[in-house]
């Protein structure tokens, strides 16, 4: 898969310092950051590539399992914490959005960490739909 020129596809916040964020399966560091544009660039590239591969075999399946429903919110110390609370870009996004009562995850402006999973899923579904409809 060839990455597009001059596009950032980092999945990590460059200012992130905590990496021992376990999943419910106890894998570390497997959570995408929905608060930075590079995550969305990466996902667009992956979906476009999947689409092009499947097109060679009589069409792309219109069902994609997004996963993510098991994003954990427990640290190894047992403290409940959403993984995105460790991402400086998400902390900044929530801080910027939470003081405006008109903001909400479904408008693309989540105001709480527990809304980021819904925000991620909704935005990813829109990207998938646009990419699938464009082929």
Regions found by a protein language model. Name each.
Residues 1-125:
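Aromatic-lined carbohydrate-binding surfaces of glycoside hydrolases
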Residues 130-135:
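Short, compositionally biased segments
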